[in-house]
């Protein structure tokens, strides 16, 4: 393991804490990272250490991580089949302050998918979108569309040889986002939070893109959700959760058609603001 290894684009799901700027500030394990106010890598005790299966049954799994001397928390994760929908799982994370003094973090869910995924997020105004462009040579910022109260992002093929890289921080108008990949749609639902509850350096929803120009499907797109930023007393816990629903999609690979599909599911899945103002879910 190396702090200079870069962001290896493994797909899947991880849980971090935020804000990112504080990852290595409140620890004595690696003084070099602390002095650099490093923003990479994430806490390895949360992401890479072996977890213990506390409970394993036919409908749910509970995993317990190790106490982290880097961020001062211990994570417990629960993944359970929904009791009401066969196509849905519930994902929950709990962080406990293991230190003898107060700490302050948020819980940060990161679902990593292929960059060819088209992601939709309900966003009311352009002012609710903050773009963090790349600084490296040979890169270009993600290109997104925002129309009818819905934000859409996907890495498309580029002929100019530029890597599509950067992050978009969003204040959503409702607690969901959806990613289309082939004949599947992953809908992630979560508790919608006011802007004041989220650390100012983050967005409640963040999308990070890193995609090669000719084969963007080989790149990485992170579908991230931040829970409220909280101060925890010694031994205190905080919790966040998401619901993941996997749907079959047989329509064309086109933004308008996919948006309309989400609108058709708005009432069933409580996808507030999924429909354009002139549309209505059946």
Where are these predicted regions, by residue range?
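Beta-strand-loop-alpha "switch" segments that mediate conformational coupling across diverse proteins
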Residues: 93
């Amino acid at each position: 393991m190396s702090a200079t290894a870069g962001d290896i684009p493994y797909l899947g799901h991880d849980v971090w804490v935020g804000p990112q700027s504080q990852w290595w500030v409140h620890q004595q394990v690696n003084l070099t990272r602390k002095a650099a106010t490093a923003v990479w890598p994430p806490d390895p005790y949360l992401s890479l250490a072996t977890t213990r299966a506390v409970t394993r049954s036919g409908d749910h799994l509970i995993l317990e991580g190790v106490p982290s001397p880097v961020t001062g928390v211990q994570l417990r994760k629960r993944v359970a089949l929904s009791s009401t929908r066969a196509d849905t799982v519930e994902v929950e994370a709990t962080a406990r302050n293991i230190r003898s003094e107060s700490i302050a973090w948020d819980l940060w869910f990161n679902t990593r998918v292929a960059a060819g995924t088209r992601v939709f997020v309900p966003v009311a105004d352009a002012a609710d979108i903050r773009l963090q462009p790349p600084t490296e040579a040979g890169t270009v910022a993600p290109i997104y569309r925002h129309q009818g109260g819905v934000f859409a992002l996907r890495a498309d093929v580029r002929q100019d040889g530029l890597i599509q890289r950067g992050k978009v921080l969003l204040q959503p108008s409702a607690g969901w986002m959806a990613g289309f990949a082939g004949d599947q749609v992953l809908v992630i639902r979560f508790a919608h939070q006011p802007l004041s509850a989220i650390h100012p350096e983050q967005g409640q929803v963040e999308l990070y893109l890193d995609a090669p120009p000719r084969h963007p499907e080989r790149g990485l797109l992170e579908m991230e959700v931040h829970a409220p930023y909280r101060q925890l007393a010694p031994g205190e816990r905080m919790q966040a959760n998401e619901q993941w629903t996997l749907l079959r999609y047989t329509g064309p690979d086109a933004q308008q058609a996919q948006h309309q599909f989400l609108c058709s599911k708005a009432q069933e899945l409580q996808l507030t603001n999924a429909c354009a103002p002139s549309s209505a879910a059946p």
